[in-house]
Amino acid sequence: MAREFKRSDRVAQELQKEVAVILQREVKDPRIGMVTVSDVEVSRDLAYAKIFVTFLFDNDPEAIKQGMKGLEKAAPYIRSLLGKAMRLRIVPELRFVYDQSLVEGMRMSNLVSNVIKNDEAKHVAEDSE
């Protein structure tokens, strides 16, 4: 019988929870600020983890750049805390990636809203003629 989830998926879910807690409670770097862990991808051999993050200040590219530098600097410390919190033989090497999917989703939503608004205005103008 096949398992419902692969082990790497289960480890990724647990990593997401633990990293979110560590970033919220343990990491004190002011460059990081309010960060959200949106997703985690773990390699099949569990040696590498790609952690997708978003920031509260998504509209400021310089703040995002500084936040990512802060996360890269804190990665070894976060990894050591993960080693204490999780029972893994090998704690994955962490790589932080800025997740633009939320920003792109908002942009697409705004584009659709604008098209609908323009279409409704066009129909109202045609009906009044």
Swiss-Prot record:
* Alphabetical UniProt keywords: Cytoplasm, Ribosome biogenesis
GO molecular function list: ribosomal small subunit binding
Pfam families from the entry? RBFA
One GO cellular component term, please give it: cytosol
**Subunit info?**
Monomer. Binds 30S ribosomal subunits, but not 50S ribosomal subunits or 70S ribosomes.
Q: What does this protein do?
A: One of several proteins that assist in the late maturation steps of the functional core of the 30S ribosomal subunit. Associates with free 30S ribosomal subunits (but not with 30S subunits that are part of 70S ribosomes or polysomes). Required for efficient processing of 16S rRNA. May interact with the 5'-terminal helix region of 16S rRNA.
Can you tell me which family this protein belongs to?
Belongs to the RbfA family.
What protein name applies here? Ribosome-binding factor A
Tell me the organism.
Actinobacillus succinogenes (strain ATCC 55618 / DSM 22257 / CCUG 43843 / 130Z)
The top of its lineage is: Bacteria, Pseudomonadati, Pseudomonadota, Gammaproteobacteria, Pasteurellales
